[in-house]
Amino acid sequence: GVQRRFNKIFTYKETNFYDDYAHHPTEIKEILNGIRSAYKKDEIICIFQPHRISRLKDLKKEFTLSFKKADTVILCPVYTAGEKIKLGFSYNDFAREIMKNSKVKLFIVKDKYQLAKFIKQTIYGKKIVVGMGAGTISSWMKELPKLL
């Protein structure tokens, strides 16, 4: 985890892309607070890959409130880490609650290719994009330049 703290990966059309290990609501909030205080005027886009459905269920409210300092959240599929999908968790409800509680725009992508396509179509100008999570998001962030 120490190696993955707000590491700059690449720049695309004036937008800087970073990678961070944050996968818990407190970490997400702290990283976004830090980015917001350093880049007051820039648009902040958080690409979030949730890690473990059990964690999402246990901390659902905290997660949905943790993105307030971002402008946009791009939600990736849950990295299950081998967990079986638990009943009683709705991904779409989770996405809606993030929008409502954190007051952000939110987009859902199904894989790294859809993520790259979304970035190509919507990202231009000076922005800060940070990929967060403890799953495969780090390798997605490193592969993005080749997919753009």
Question: What is the predicted role of each segment?
Answer:
Residues 1-72:
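Nucleotide phosphate-binding/pyrophosphate-handling subdomain across enzymes
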Residues 6, 17, 106-107, 129:
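Generic structural signal for residues in well-ordered beta-strands
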Residues 30, 58-60, 86-87, 120, ...:
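Short amphipathic alpha-helical segments
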Residues 33-37, 61-65, 89-91, 125, ...:
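Short, solvent-exposed amphipathic alpha-helical segments in soluble enzyme
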Residues 50-53, 78-81, 134-137:
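Short glycine-rich anion-binding loops that position phosphate/pyrophosphate groups of nucleotides
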Residues 64-125:
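C-terminal helical cap/extension that packs against the catalytic core
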Residues 114-145:
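A glycine-rich beta-strand to alpha-helix segment
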